[in-house]
Amino acid sequence: DIFAGWGFILRRPEISRIVLAKGMWATGGGAQIFLLIIIGMEADFGDISTGAAGIGVLYMARGFGSGFGPIVTRPLMTVTRYMPYIIGLSLGGAGLLYVGVSQAEWGVWTLVLVFFSHGCSGISWVFSTTLLQRRTDNDWMGRVAGTDNLIIVLTMGVSTIAAGYILEE
């Protein structure tokens, strides 16, 4: 059944593109865990000192952004033909905003950039999952969703391990 599900995904480009795009996002998603920790340890967020509190504030901005993006763009989900474009734009936006994080002075602006970057990530996550559900027959949905999650978790795990190894060297 698993191999039949993989075959189904590969034969349907409108499904495989979404599954592979989410997997590609995960290549940086795992390493990003360390990035937020490093920034949180060194950034100055005003009254909040660096260290554990700084890490917590960054992850708070990340979490709020991840919820904010899909809520704000929810009305756009009714237009299915726009969804692939919104997914692409939001993935690109998330990446560009992290380029901004790399260029900005680590402080309050970092929180704003992380918030909006993860707003974009949340949009791509919710829209791509919804689009997969709409495009996949019920008979195949479990295998498609399972493969989607397998690719994401495996890729994020490898990305996290690689980033940890790079930081140790």
Show the residue positions of the predicted features.
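Alpha-helical transmembrane segments of multi-pass integral membrane proteins
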Residues: 15-25, 84-87, 109
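Aromatic side chains
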Residues: 8, 32-34, 59, 98
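Short coil/turn helix-boundary motifs
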Residues: 9-13, 30, 79-80, 154
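Conserved extracellular-gate-facing transmembrane-helix segments in secondary transporters
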Residues: 21, 25-36, 121, 156
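Transmembrane helix irregularities
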Residues: 9-10, 27, 103, 136
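C-terminal transmembrane bundle of multi-pass solute transporters/carriers
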Residues: 3, 41-169
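Juxtamembrane intracellular "pre-TM" segments in multi-pass secondary transporters
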Residues: 1-20
